[in-house]
């Protein structure tokens, strides 16, 4: 078998996770967020596995066009909207919805001639202060969109949470109250909930939920695990041992000689490194799963390899599988060791890592 790393994507896990989220939000439609190459799982892979989703959320127009070219006919929404007037005919021609969050987008809609109107989701800044119109701007912007012949009616309404992944933080309730007060009585769909909203704030679920990371079997909350919500990891990042060697006490290993063995042991070298997207800053003790057990990374992660301490009595051999994260070793656990979030790990794999449906 090829010793180089691969990301094995489970179609059944993706489908299980979609079903679990529907169970969490039975009255809501699901806008499956597949931006950033399906969170590193492969854009078309994910969309084809989640064909029963009600729509797909994307960050960029080229992602939406790739889905249309791949035969996806479901509703598509550009979560950051469009950035050039020349994008608008493409939205019309490919039946792609757009978020409007900035006055420049509103002006382009008003000034462009289109063959038919575009479906718009008006983004309200309810407190994240990143994208969206403030409550003070909202009524004027809404009126201009209503008057614009290039905008399909009704206008849909959305916001995004800043702290929904902190279940004890009341700021999410503040944001919900602001959004609901501002949009009360208006027609159109409403969408507030991301993964954390769908899982932890049921009152936010609205007409559509927009799960991202949870679809891939990962909890959005630090210290939590997707399995606690009936979610199954969709990605298994797998490589192999390409060397097994005896190592003497008091001898270092790796660049910089930062780790020294306290006793005689056996080391394994795994064919994955920062050139594949595995973080160079993974500290000593970060776990890797080899032959049914966790073994710690020792020494510095290099471009193509990392080293693990297999233990004095290890029977592991060259060619044995090494799981960097997956069902047996949750990516949330690995991220916590490294001091990052699971989102970053799954989306930063480089093109050297083969992504394949398993």
UniProtKB/Swiss-Prot annotation:
Coiled coil (residue ranges): none
InterPro entries: Ala_racemase, Ala_racemase/Decarboxylase_C, Ala_racemase_C, Ala_racemase_N, Ala_racemase_pyridoxalP-BS, PLP-binding_barrel
Name listed for the protein in its UniProt record: Alanine racemase
One MF annotation (Gene Ontology) recorded for this entry: pyridoxal phosphate binding
Record-listed N6-(pyridoxal phosphate)lysine modification sites: 35
Record: active site: 35, 255
Family the entry assigns: Belongs to the alanine racemase family.
HAMAP family xref list: Ala_racemase
